[in-house]
């Protein structure tokens, strides 16, 4: 019987073990998409205790706690202490067997805390609390210290177009940090004209760009100024959260002005008008990214804020989102083609939340590849609810069957936690085991030089090349 979480965790044969320990594990981390706070990196935040760093803002864990029947006060309540929340988590973890949280929890205790051979639960919680808190009190366990321990080379944060990016500038000017922290442009509030807060957001954009916005060209000018600001701060990627993928042929500016004018006047837009405006903004932005050498990321298919009562209580991003089931193939094809037809499609990474769409994306990317850029259009790593063993395997296998796995830019944390870098380790173990199994079964050559190069490329090299502006 196998022992739980040894050094060879998830590695089922000698080929897999060699690929992981010799080639994957030593590679740096290029975490091109995350939700870390740039202020916490700039300030080199020190965490008071394990409960704070482990549970603060982690809606994956919050969902598990709620599923276990834990009172909300012990999840997000301001009236309860970090220790009380931590003990609620300790009592919940043994109930998460089969959920990736059980693996992640123990991987996070191994690295960076060095706790091995101990199962986390109510019986061990006090000892682990003491051991981890002692380490968190040292400089090596500050925000930057943890990133350095985990061999992080680059992180891409997620930032609104109106953000000042002051903390990114502060980090760039700080010679004491050798990790690149680049902003990523996230313009969701610009193209989602149907949202209640759209008009209020446009006023904030006006102030940030110093441009009055009454016509569509005014919006272009405001966005251009903010794009320039992001570029000056080292941005080279954008990200878009798309719940419903809409497409309509882009109308002329007179029609776009009329649509924007109606919205500013508080009038209700038709579904066609929403699609026309959304498409116009996304296509224009995509062309701007192409001109700047940026990567465009599309995260497609979440259904957000399902629980109205809890949304009113806690706001967004608190663990009440799930997988949507809208059809995406036609609209995605037309959206990408609208940029490609003028040879202005940027490097693009497509992510789907619904795994039924894996093959849609795996085949879609082959329609829009381009010369001189290996893997110009990518099928991104298993996202969110697919960020687990089966989800990662499905994505890797379907990409390999319908595209080129060797050109894949690999894993990202998509996380708000400084302890989530072990997700790269999790991914690397799964990748190496998959290749090792194929080689053992005679499906691919047992050629260490060939396989090791592929592993190192997927773990780091491909992403580093892909996100470099030439």
Swiss-Prot record:
The pathway entry for this protein reads as: Carbohydrate metabolism; pentose and glucuronate interconversion
Q: Recorded GO terms, molecular function?
A: glucuronate isomerase activity
Looking at the keywords, is Iron-sulfur present?
no
**Could you tell me the Gene Ontology terms of the biological process aspect for this record?**
D-galacturonate catabolic process; D-glucuronate catabolic process
Identify the species of origin.
Answer: Salmonella typhimurium (strain LT2 / SGSC1412 / ATCC 700720)
Mind telling me what this protein is named?
Answer: Uronate isomerase
Does the record's keyword annotation contain Isomerase?
yes
> EC number(s)?
5.3.1.12
Query: Which NCBIfam families does this UniProt record tie to the protein?
Result: PRK02925.1 (NF002794)
